[in-house]
């Protein structure tokens, strides 16, 4: 009985692990997680409302939802859960790396989205409580990231569809509503206490430290880099000196664009506090665990350390981008910066690992189809045609030929009979 039970448990664990890895692969493609993240940067060619709704709030985060809703499977496999957490930790750092290197305001936000979803995926791999935090951050992130994507669209509207942050500067003076609403999203994403991001993302960092120091430190480093590149975005876009092109006359967007920004800015600040006291209980039936409630201004040791790291990131972003900002992106030979500008060579890796082998395989299959499959089909037709050409010569219309064939046939039959009797 015990032996059968052990076999059942092993089989359950094996299948759960396999299913967990397959679901994780699907989630990586859906939510732009390493190594299937390259498409998200290219998707920034679409309109900013699409980015706000689909890339920040709904479609791209669906992979996180998939993993969380599959928690019953991951509960039976520590290996797959660990893989989810590792993918999330790597992605949150890679996304922050990309965001720190880009000059395009939308691609900075795309790298940021990739990084924040990495936080969600990390949380989803930390167990039931982490899964609840993943959904919590998914909701708050939808508000402040949609706010910033629409804010980027407002900046583009006011600057002639330009997305190069080196062509901006001092836009807070001519676009005050866009600036202040964007600033609310900025405060939320870096996790200033009291904002939505503080309640959701800082919970994830604390949960990561509970799981292990490695995950906690990686999440903490990501928080510092996030503060840096978002401060860089604010400095290059809204603060400092103006660097507008001569034919550009920045102006504030109309009310039809700023009113949604105001609504999302309010949610960016207050939604986390509003959901903090009930989100865990609400998600408990789906995730299997409650989330510990944290008071508005309660901050443990990890929270204090996180705030210090965030402040250091803010200071670094301010010091490195407050003076002598050029009108064009400066050239660099820094390998880290170059890699970030090239999306950490995601497209190149895909070309080597997927595209070229895929073309080689497709060429081999096409050659097999031409030479073997078509060869058999066409060969059978050719043989049939050749045989018919031979046989048709027998039917030549001459009686003497038919008589000869009859004689030959009788002789052959006679030989067969005689030889058969002799045998």
Regions found by a protein language model. Give the residues of each.
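Aromatic-capped, Gly/Pro-kinked transmembrane alpha-helices
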Residues: 279-301, 319-423
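Hydrophobic alpha-helical membrane-embedded segments
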Residues: 145, 224-232, 309-328
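Hard-cation-handling environments
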Residues: 240, 250-314
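Hydrophobic transmembrane alpha-helices and their helix-loop junctions in integral membrane proteins
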Residues: 6-256, 267, 273
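Hydrophobic alpha-helical membrane-embedded or membrane-associated segments
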Residues: 60, 145, 224-227, 264, ...
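Positively charged, low-complexity/disordered segments
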Residues: 1-5
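Hydrophobic alpha-helical membrane-insertion segments
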Residues: 185-189, 260-277, 359-363, 411-413
